[in-house]
Regions:
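Beta-rich carbohydrate-recognition modules and glycan-binding surfaces
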Residues: 189-220, 231, 235-375, 552-554
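Middle-to-C-terminal accessory/interaction subdomains
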Residues: 432-440, 526-528, 535-552, 559-562, ...
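Intrinsically disordered, low-complexity linkers and terminal tails enriched in Ser/Thr/Pro/Gly
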Residues: 23-33, 42-53, 57, 62-63, ...
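Short, compositionally stereotyped local motifs that mark structural "simplifiers"
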Residues: 168-172, 177, 402, 410-569, ...
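Disordered, low-complexity segments in secreted/periplasmic proteins that are enriched in proline
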Residues: 66-67, 205-243, 466, 547-549, ...
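C-terminal motif of bacterial Sec signal peptides marking the signal peptidase cleavage site
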Residues: 18-21
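Conserved ATP-binding subdomain of kinase catalytic cores across diverse folds
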Residues: 558-715
């Protein structure tokens, strides 16, 4: 369920503190060098992708501080109810302590004191990109204050739990201490700042005249563009350009009040990929000493701008980072370069590019007022963490006297515990490194949800009781202070979506209450409710789900709204079958349309990503009952069945799960029914996300420690996270080195999980995926450990006999074509079938397969493994069983889905028959093609059995049955290994051989048993 905060106990009795004025309140806060420290998110509750943004962040500067009476000291208006009753105190009452705890002497009158606490931090990143709790200090004096030797603690029995090191708080300035447990005692200020602004600006656009369509045999994929040109428009947007100057400006870079600014209105053309502004550096700059970019300015709200560099004349190999707009000119955006730019060489940066990839009818406006690169330094980090459910903090000087204290209880994620200019503590909008924003509230309005029935499926009217002052909206619109006030008791008898918030004077608004009441029988499948603003999602002109006004005529309708990379906040609830009024969970997250060519389908695929700013960083729920080990998710997808939407329900689930038990990663899934704002939208395929967070869920790895490479529509291996440098270096080495020798083979086998690669390749080859390997191929490793590269199986819509599959030749030639997969190769020579074109660079899509097959041991293992898999995972019996199982899961819901979307039931039935026919006949086709390609001799059957507790491995592949008959080839020796289970011992083979690993020749050995005891 969505978390609702209760009982925010504001139980400290505070002294009223009148703080000094810290500068002219009208003073501009636009510092050309930007803020000093901290990665701050916008005070609006909009989500952020790759980095964060702030509308007010100026530590260490001379900007206005907390307003007061203008003095540099801290005069006190004493509270007669103070338990401490210490003159000059600004502290809150320490919590009751045990009799053994000695409360430090309270001294007070410190120029440095607590000004804000954020135990649930959702909008401030530390130097490592994490978001621990934090406490803010303010120095109200006219001189810096040295805190060396001072202490911070949350436990009076340990008053010097954490001690400040080299920390000086500048005059009239704020300072953050992160409560992370990392124990960084020093305050390292930013350094090595480089002004990246320049008056030399131009624009570039990439557009394709045919809307992204590729003709068969041209080597492209359905999601990419067919050509299109790069158009540069030096000095500003020209007539017909997709990058125009700001209104009233004659150039993209212009002088405003004596300072250079960058401004543009950008739009992606029909069928295009991007439009961007290119800002040259003053010289070819080195960024070797910097680890952060700081960009201040306006970006259209919820639109994304991708920042990248040109190194020399070309775009860098770094994938860049997204800035998500807030619609505020004073917003500050941060990009971390230390961990996120491993493919950036940094020593020859000639320009910065600001690109929009936002498709649709809307344009994206930017106005950059300052842009620097720097070494960000870091704030101090305490050696302890703060309890998000509440606690206390104490500030103690070197002599052991208490200077300040603050108590706090559980704080809503959207708020902090903040002190205003009059010394009053309360809930407020988080404002790290800045003045308290707006009013502070002593408490949050509480709503007894027990009186409001849960979301769900109902057949009779329900009654909900709301507290006085509750304002609600229907249909998915978010409530505001202007929304209608509802009656205390509301009766609901038809499908209704309610979004409500309780308001009361002097109190922080309640958490949002979201309910969806669907008046119909619960479906037999699990259901997902998606609640969101209806105009943002479904407005004919601007709705994210809709085509809009800027779409190309041809599929995939590039330029349509659904090609936008915008995200929308949504509330998602799930209902398991048989539990119509018991939501399994309810979470806020960001919604994004996903997919490539399939976006043009009426039913859209989408992804939901959890963000801490909405309350929860991870969904802790077993989404997939067949895989109870998967319990924590950053994100999940709901697919429309890809390019087969409206054709079948099984192809991709069947194709990706073929490797179950083989160690190849794939997206687990289940079928669900989706409702948008209470309206039925049919069957979707709930799947894991195939990004870096998959490895956190599956293996517990840090998602920031994953090198994840994707071969995408551009046809190159790009790092979606981490770095591609080592992988590309390996491919470069393979261009000039064969793997015939064991030494060279070992060099690659030390970097690549060869068994994993064989299993992956053979799955793709069996299902005959023609949208691969020039597209839809992913490989990954743990970066810090430099583990071996493994592969990820996904997006197999083009397999299992789909009508638009253009790959009709020999699949072994297809994956060994030196020029890639745009045409058919015809094998190697000398025992490997036919002659292949030679000379020139080998395609990065096929070079690994080509080189590995040069090694005799690998080639034999590859052939033998395929033989086993044709009798195991790829056998007709197993595949048909899987097809029937998948189809039976959706059977009862198919008719409604087909009627709602206008699918042809007869056509879908024929498509299912095609899938079954392929699953039964593909084994023979693979054998024919393999025999032709490798020039193999006649097959020979061999029965392999295990007796006792153990199993047999065939060239490294473990059999999953105790007895299996496999058809091998007489001229390809088979390596067998007997592997005992724990507690068991291998005693020998049935023919008297005692070596655990042995080679046998098919035809000479027809049956053998491994014996264990």
């Amino acid at each position: 369920m969505k978390k609702f905060y209760s009982g925010v106990a504001l139980f400290g009795i505070s002294f009223g503190l009148v703080l000094s004025a810290c500068g002219d309140s009208n003073e501009s806060k636009l510092n050309p060098l930007g803020p000093e420290l901290g990665d701050v998110s916008s005070s609006s509750i909009s989500g952020f992708d790759d980095l964060s943004s702030s509308t007010d962040f100026l530590p260490g500067g001379s900007s206005a501080g907390i307003p007061g009476d203008g003095s540099s000291s801290s005069p006190v208006a004493l509270s007669s109810s103070s338990a401490l009753d210490v003159p000059g105190s600004s502290a809150q009452v320490p919590p009751a302590s045990s009799v053994s705890t000695v409360i430090p002497r309270f001294e007070g009158n410190s120029p440095v004191f607590f000004s804000e606490v954020s135990p649930t931090n959702a909008n401030l990143k530390d130097n490592d990109g994490n978001d621990p709790g934090w406490v803010e200090f303010y120095n109200s004096s006219d001189t810096p204050v040295d805190l060396n030797g001072y202490a911070l603690t949350d436990d009076l029995s340990n008053p010097r739990r954490w001690v400040f090191g080299n920390v000086k708080v500048p005059a009239k300035s704020y300072m953050i201490v992160f409560l992370s447990g990392k124990n960084y005692p020093d305050y390292i200020l930013p350094s090595d700042s480089l002004n990246m602004m320049n008056s030399d600006c131009s624009s570039e656009s990439a557009s394709g005249s045919l809307g992204g369509f590729n003709f068969p045999g041209m080597g492209g994929d359905w999601g990419g563009g067919m050509g299109g040109g790069m158009g540069g428009y030096p000095g500003g947007g020209s007539s017909g350009s997709n990058v125009d100057n700001l209104q009233g400006k004659s150039t993209l870079c212009f002088n405003e009040n004596g300072a250079i600014q960058i401004g543009a209105v950008m739009k992606v053309a029909q069928g295009g990929d991007y439009s961007r502004v290119v800002v040259k550096t003053n010289n070819a700059s080195s960024l070797s000493k910097v680890n952060q970019l700081v960009v201040r300015g306006f970006i259209t709200k919820n639109h994304k701008i991708r920042v990248n560099f040109k190194e020399g004349e070309s775009l860098s190999n770094w994938s860049g980072k997204n800035l998500r707009g807030t619609g505020d000119l004073s917003s500050v955006f941060y990009v971390r370069l230390d961990d996120n730019a491993k493919d950036l060489k940094r020593n020859n940066v000639t320009a910065t590019t600001f690109a929009t990839e936002t498709q649709g009818s809307e344009s994206t406006t930017i106005q950059i007022t300052s842009y620097i690169a720097r070494n960000r330094g870091h704030e101090p980090h305490a050696s302890f963490k703060v309890d998000k459910d509440g606690g206390a903090l104490y500030f103690i000087n070197a002599e052991g006297a208490m200077l300040d204290s603050v108590r706090f209880s559980a704080v809503p994620t959207t708020a902090s515990w903040s002190r205003d200019g009059a010394g009053k503590w309360g809930l407020a909008t988080p404002s790290p490194y800045g003045n308290t924003i707006g009013e502070v509230f002593a408490e949050q309005v509480q709503v007894a949800e027990v009186n409001i029935p849960p979301s769900g499926f109902y057949t009779s009217a329900v009654t909900a009781t709301f507290p006085a002052g509750t304002r609600c909206e229907q249909g998915g619109t978010e409530p505001t202070t202007n929304s209608p006030v509802v009656q205390t008791t509301v009766t609901i008898s038809a499908t209704t979506v309610l979004r409500c918030r309780a308001y009361a004077g002097g109190s922080y608004p309640s958490e949002e209450i979201i309910r969806t009441y669907v008046f119909e029988k619960q479906p037999s499948l699990a259901s997902i409710f998606v609640t969101t603003d209806p105009l943002s999602m479904f407005s004919p002109d601007s709705g994210l789900y809709m085509t809009g006004n800027g779409a190309a005529m041809m599929d995939p309708k590039k330029g349509a709204n659904f090609w936008s990379n915008r995200e929308l906040p949504v509330y998602v609830e799930m209902f398991e079958p048989g539990k119509p009024q018991a939501p399994a969970f309810g979470v806020m997250g960001d919604y994004k349309i996903s997919g490539q060519y399939s976006r043009a389908k009426e039913k859209k695929s989408f992804a939901v990503t959890l963000r801490e700013e909405y309350g929860e960083k991870r969904l802790k729920y077993t989404l997939f009952p067949d895989h109870p080990e998967l319990k924590k998710f950053k994100a999940f997808s709901l697919r429309n069945f890809g390019n087969n939407s409206g054709d079948d329900y099984v192809r991709d689930r069947l194709g990706t799960s073929m490797t179950e038990g083989l160690g190849v990663d794939y997206q687990r899934g289940r079928y669900v029914i989706v409702y948008y704002n209470g309206k039925y939208y049919g069957i979707h395929d709930l799947r894991e996300r195939n990004n870096e967070y998959y490895y956190e869920t599956k293996y517990g790895y840090d998602p920031n420690d994953i090198d994840l490479l994707a071969t995408t529509s551009s046809g190159t291996d790009e790092a979606s996270t981490g770095s591609s440098a080592d992988y590309k270096a390996m491919l470069d080495w393979l261009q000039s080195n064969d793997l015939k020798s064991d030494a060279n083979y070992k060099k690659i086998a030390d970097q690549v999980d060869v068994d994993n690669y064989m299993n992956y390749m053979q799955a793709e080859m069996f299902l005959n995926n023609s949208d691969w390997p020039h597209n839809n191929m992913k490989k990954w490793r743990v970066a810090s450990q430099k583990t071996k590269w493994k592969w990820f199986l996904y997006d197999t819509d083009f397999g299992f006999g789909v009508s638009y599959n253009t790959q009709t030749g020999n699949v072994f030639s297809y994956v060994t074509n030196r020029s890639g997969t745009s045409g058919m190769g015809i094998g190697f020579g000398g025992g490997m079938g036919g002659g292949q074109q030679t000379g020139g660079a080998i395609s990065e899509h096929t070079i690994l397969m080509i080189r590995l097959l040069e090694n005799e041991s690998f080639k034999n293992a590859f052939i033998n493994r395929f033989c086993v898999l044709l009798s195991m995972n790829f056998s007709a019996d197993r595949l048909l069983k899987r097809i029937n199982d998948l189809q039976s899961q959706v059977e009862s819901e198919m008719a409604r889905d087909q009627e709602f979307w206008g699918y042809n039931a007869s056509s879908m039935s024929n498509n299912l028959a095609t899938v079954k026919s392929f699953a039964q006949s593909r084994q023979a086709t693979i054998r024919e093609q393999m025999e032709s390609y490798f020039t193999l001799s006649s097959p020979a059957e061999m029965t392999l059995s295990s007796q006792g507790s153990g199993t047999i491995l065939v060239d490294g592949l473990q059999l999953d049955k105790s007895s299996m008959t496999v058809s091998f080839y007489r001229d390809v020796p088979v390596t067998l290994t007997a592997q005992a289970n724990s507690g068991s011992t291998f005693t020998g083979w049935s023919d008297g051989v005692t070596d655990a690993t042995r080679k046998v020749n098919p035809g000479e050995v027809t049956s053998v048993t491994a014996v264990f005891r």
